[in-house]
């Protein structure tokens, strides 16, 4: 979308988050036609869609306790710094967003769990800005940029994708 702005937490920059789309897909009974209507038709035409009338969404909201919040670049840097100072652990920018918002929703006596979402090395520039040094690179990623890249564009056809995977498994 033309309204999407680049930030130091790029998964938050996308207008159509695939993980959210996947969640809604599963929530609504894995109905591809309904997902297309929501994410392609309604979102493109109106910039949003509303699930509040859906019984499945009402149930999920109650079950999962949806909450939201925001995190700016400055918040992200401060959270990375505070986690490092407190735990001597480097977290990535997405996890920092989650920690920042989770801290706002904490309740006394109620545990809060935030799952790490990426490796800090993926966001080395922001980690360096926050901590004054680059995060360590896991050994398994040394030289990854020099490895060959393989890309195959295919139509959005489940049968063709499955066939390609089966034929190209090594």
What are these regions (language model features)?
Residues 1-170:
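PLP-dependent amino-acid enzyme catalytic core
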């Amino acid at each position: 979308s033309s309204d999407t702005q680049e930030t130091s937490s790029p998964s938050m920059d996308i207008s159509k988050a695939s993980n959210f789309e996947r969640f809604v897909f599963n929530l609504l009974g894995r109905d591809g036609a309904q997902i297309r209507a929501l994410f392609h038709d309604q979102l493109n035409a109106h910039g949003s869609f509303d699930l509040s009338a859906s019984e499945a969404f009402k149930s999920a909201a109650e079950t999962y306790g949806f909450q939201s919040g925001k995190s700016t670049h400055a918040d992200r840097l401060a959270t990375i710094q505070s986690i490092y100072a407190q735990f001597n652990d480097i977290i990535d920018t997405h996890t920092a967003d989650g920690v920042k918002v989770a801290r706002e929703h904490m309740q006394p006596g109620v545990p809060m769990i935030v799952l790490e979402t990426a490796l800090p090395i993926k966001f080395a520039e922001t980690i360096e800005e926050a901590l004054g040094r680059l995060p360590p690179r896991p050994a398994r990623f040394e030289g990854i940029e020099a490895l060959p890249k393989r890309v195959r564009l295919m139509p959005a056809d489940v049968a063709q994708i499955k066939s390609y995977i089966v034929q190209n498994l090594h």
